[in-house]
Amino acid sequence: MALWMHLLTVLALLALWGPNTGQAFVSRHLCGSNLVETLYSVCQDDGFFYIPKDRRELEDPQVEQTELGMGLGAGGLQPLALEMALQKRGIVDQCCTGTCTRHQLQSYCN
């Protein structure tokens, strides 16, 4: 009987010290189908929207020029905004080449 009480106490302490569900997803590499499945899990019913860079360029060849302030408009982006646009990375670069958190994945949800 004392052994069972000791075992239950140890199990309770392990449960308290174990990672909770909010912290279980820290930062990880996600590529290919693992990335897509994780996005489905994170976004759930909201879904997500993603156009690969190659396809986006085929649909609108001026998208990069406009994003970087080289297209038509009122003089393009300011220097700080231009620098941030140059550093902007897609989800594959962010999560497959590097690592991403649950919060970063949620930014790709609709």
Swiss-Prot record:
The keyword Signal applies. One of its GO terms (cellular component) is extracellular space. Pfam families: Insulin. InterPro entries: Insulin, Insulin-like, Insulin-like_sf, Insulin_CS, Insulin_family. Keywords: Carbohydrate metabolism, Cleavage on pair of basic residues, Disulfide bond, Glucose metabolism, Hormone, Secreted, Signal. Residues 1-24 form the signal peptide. Transmembrane segments: none annotated. Disulfide bonds join C31-C96, C43-C109, C95-C100. The keyword Acetylation does not apply. It is found in: Secreted. GO terms for biological process: acute-phase response; alpha-beta T cell activation; fatty acid homeostasis; G protein-coupled receptor signaling pathway; glucose homeostasis; glucose metabolic process; insulin receptor signaling pathway; negative regulation of acute inflammatory response. Residues 57-87 form a propeptide. GO terms for molecular function: hormone activity; identical protein binding; insulin receptor binding; insulin-like growth factor receptor binding; protease binding. Belongs to the insulin family. Heterodimer of a B chain and an A chain linked by two disulfide bonds. PANTHER family: INSULIN, INSULIN/INSULIN GROWTH FACTOR. Insulin decreases blood glucose concentration. It increases cell permeability to monosaccharides, amino acids and fatty acids. It accelerates glycolysis, the pentose phosphate cycle, and glycogen synthesis in liver. This is Insulin. The gene is INS.
